């Protein structure tokens, strides 16, 4: 059975689930779609870094350039939603920050996911993060920029989604806590 999860008319990309093959296929109707190439390069960079840090993980992606799609393995995991507050997602934010510290090389200029939010992470067994959706991948950005994006989006997106006029104080306090912990003692560019 085949199921179309979504199709973005603006980006001209979509996601299909093939249950018989146990794969997720990301495709583009635009043959010059750079985001699909970024997705493949970024995810494979991440897998290479991830593999060297975490054992017993075997993922294989397949880029079929001729037909403009990427096959990803089906990953059974929990998805966290961006509209949950930082307080609600605090456990997952902590896990993800620790994951970043373990996986990303400690160079001042590094690879960048480009859209790191809780929405773009799958959590196996509620604990092991797998970062997905690498379409905005870049090779040369400042180390920690993804965590900046993660923390800012964790307070802004729920506020916007719930149409609030301000960010609750508890959210700002948590933001400051994790920002300070992450960047304390780090030399930033």
Question: Where would I find each of the regions flagged by the language model?
Answer:
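Conserved kinase catalytic-core helix
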Residues: 37-67, 73-119
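Active-site Asp-x-Gly
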Residues: 127-172
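Helix-rich C-terminal or lid/interface subdomains of diverse kinases
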Residues: 69-71, 149-152, 168-189
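ATP-binding glycine-rich loop module of kinase domains
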Residues: 5-44
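Short, flexible/disordered intra-domain loops and linkers
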Residues: 28-38, 83-85, 157-173
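Hydrophobic residues embedded in beta-strands of well-ordered beta-sheets
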Residues: 22-24, 68-70, 127-129
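Anionic group-transfer/hydrolysis microenvironments
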Residues: 28, 75, 117, 135, ...
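Active-site acidic catalytic loop and adjacent metal/ATP-binding pocket
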Residues: 16-19, 104-145
């Amino acid at each position: 059975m085949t199921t179309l999860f979504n199709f973005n008319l603006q980006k001209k990309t979509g996601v299909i689930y093939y249950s018989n093959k146990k794969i997720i296929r990301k495709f583009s109707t635009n043959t010059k779609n750079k985001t699909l190439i970024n997705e493949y390069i970024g995810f494979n960079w991440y897998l290479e870094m991830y593999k060297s840090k975490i054992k017993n993980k075997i993922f294989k992606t397949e880029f079929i350039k001729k037909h403009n799609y990427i096959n990803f393995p089906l990953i059974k995991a929990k998805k966290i939603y961006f509209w949950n507050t930082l307080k609600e997602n605090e456990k997952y934010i902590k896990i993800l920050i620790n994951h970043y510290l373990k996986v990303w090389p400690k160079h001042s200029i590094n690879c960048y996911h480009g859209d790191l939010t809780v929405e773009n992470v799958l959590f196996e067994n509620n604990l092991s993060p797998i970062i997905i959706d690498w379409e905005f991948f870049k090779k040369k950005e400042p180390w920690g920029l993804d965590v900046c994006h993660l923390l800012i989006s964790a307070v802004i997106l729920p506020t916007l989604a719930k149409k609030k006029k301000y960010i609750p104080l508890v959210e700002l306090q948590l933001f400051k806590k994790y920002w300070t912990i992450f960047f304390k003692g780090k030399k930033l560019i």
